[in-house]
C-alpha cells in the first residue's frame, strides 16, 4: 500500500523530517528535480501539509534516540512552516537526547516577514545553503522568488543566527562552482565567522 505521506526518512545515521514542499528557491541542482525520493526513501512529495501532530506522531514512531541526529530537511524549505518546525524541534529536545539540525536556504526572515533568527535557538546546528559567492550568481542558480536581495538576506541571517545557535554552517555544492568561486565562498564564511561545509552534488 502506498504511503500517503513520507514525513520521516533515514539518511545514513540521521533521521530526516520532510514537513513541507514549499520553497522560496528553485535551485537548478535541487535533488527534487530528478526524482520523487532521496537516499532510497519513498516519495517525498506530500499530498498535503502534515499537521504538527502528524509530524510529531511520525517522529515518535521513528524513535529519534536510535539516530545520531534529527534533521529538518526534505522536499521543501522547513522555515516556510516556521512555527511548526520550531514546535517540533522543541518537543524533540524536551523528550529525546539526540541533537537537532535544520538545513535551510537562510531566507526565513524574508519568508516570514520579520527577524526570525532568535527562533532558531532551539537548534543545535543551523546549516545554511550558501551556493554562490555573489548575489548575481546566487540568483542565477537558485532562482529565489525574492530576486537578488535573497542573497544578502541569507548572509544577514547567518550573521544573526550564530548569536542563537551553537553551530552555524554555510554549505556549498562543489560541482556547481569554479575553484575561484569556492575560494570566494570560503573567504565569505571567514568574514562572517562561520564554518563552510563543502558537499558533493547528489543527482
Predicted regions, residues:
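Canonical Radical SAM [4Fe-4S] cluster-binding loop centered on the CxxxCxxC motif
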Residues: 2-50
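Conserved AdoMet/S-adenosylmethionine-binding subsite of the radical SAM
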Residues: 75-203
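A generic local structural motif
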Residues: 2-4, 56-59, 112-116
